[in-house]
Amino acid sequence: MNRDSLLTPNRRGTDSVKWGLYGEDVLALWVADTDFQSPPAVIEALQERVAHGVFGYPLHPQELRELVAARMLERFNWRISPKDMIFIPGVVPGFNLTCQLLTKPGESVLVQPPVYPPILNAAEKTGARNIHVELVRQTDGSYAVDFDALEAAIEEDTRCLIFCNPHNPVGKVYSRQELERLVEICLRHKLTIISDEIHSDLIFKGSQHIPIASLSDEVSKSTVTLIAPSKTFNIAGLSCAVLICTNHELLKKIENTSHGLLGDVNLLGLTAAIAAYRDGSGWLEHMMEVLEGNRDFTFDFIEKRLPQIKMHSPDATYLAWLDCRELALEESPYKFFLKKAKVALNCGDDFGDCGKGFVRLNFGCSRELLTEALEKMEKAIRER
């Protein structure tokens, strides 16, 4: 299997958000889906299901429950039961709904920017309010939690922390020591943890993902974990995610509330998830090799040819968080690179105030496309 065997030749004209939002002359390295074709096992399973020709209301397969439980044990040494989960259309609806159930209007939710924009928006959708406790950028470009600031920010009406691990956009994988300290604070203040772990399959060598709920039975019962095969196997459009909670009283409350609000999981999403989790491990291993090569290529290119941009090599995800503040641009780097380089990135402002002057780059694409985009960015900087 060579690098190019993963790639979709052309996504333009396929109603892709990533490739359809901007003009034909713009290279899309923004929204977090890859340009890689899904695993052959997934495509074959979908073709077989479509050939059946009937697409009525689906049951939630026991096979998928068992596959998820086995996957959590095998990959993360986290023992859960098939009864500890429900299937929902997406991670974002999952944390929005959970936040709604845990808070009343005016109560507060902890978030840690720079972070995935829907996490910043979750509280406002329910009438609650955010308390921002920014991650601290270190001299090497990595990020750390200021635990003293986090605890000091907790108010009497703070109900939960929306946590992101692996972290989007900075690519941080939290250590056991960091997780244990975070958990200690949350348990002491009786905060529920809503943990977005959608990127947990996309871990590079040298790092290890630890589900925060796996630390103890006590924290498990105070945590709602959200995962999905969508980022891993590039099936976001099929709308299937997993919400895990060993507190069955809370899980049942979430499930009951979801009916009529979230809608059901897509039938083909269930089919794809089963095939991906059952038969996609070899494909995933190869994709991670490709992503690691792209990550290292991006880092080396920026270090050598774009020295005014700073990048810390991520521990996980296919996303690079680029500090462009030294460029001293008159406009946001997002607008600059879109107009001058014809490269679409994510605007750092969307990830919180501390994201101003940053962009997020998606390197889940062909090496050729990645090279072309970086060279266009280099040319735009040189000619400004």
Task: Please provide the spans of the model-predicted regions.
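N-terminal small-domain helix-loop-helix segment of the aminotransferase-like
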Residues: 1-90, 97, 278, 384
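Conserved core segment of the aminotransferase class I/II
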Residues: 44, 217, 221-292, 382
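Conserved core of the PLP fold type I
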Residues: 55-184, 201-202, 209-214, 218
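Short Gly/Ser/Thr- and Asp/Glu-enriched loop/turn motifs at secondary-structure junctions
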Residues: 81-82, 313-318, 356
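Helix C-cap/helix->beta junction micro-motif
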Residues: 126, 188-189, 219, 341, ...
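Conserved glycine-rich beta-strand-loop-beta hairpin in the small C-terminal domain of fold type I
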Residues: 274, 290-299, 311-324
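PLP-dependent enzyme catalytic core of the Aspartate aminotransferase-like
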Residues: 336-345, 351-384
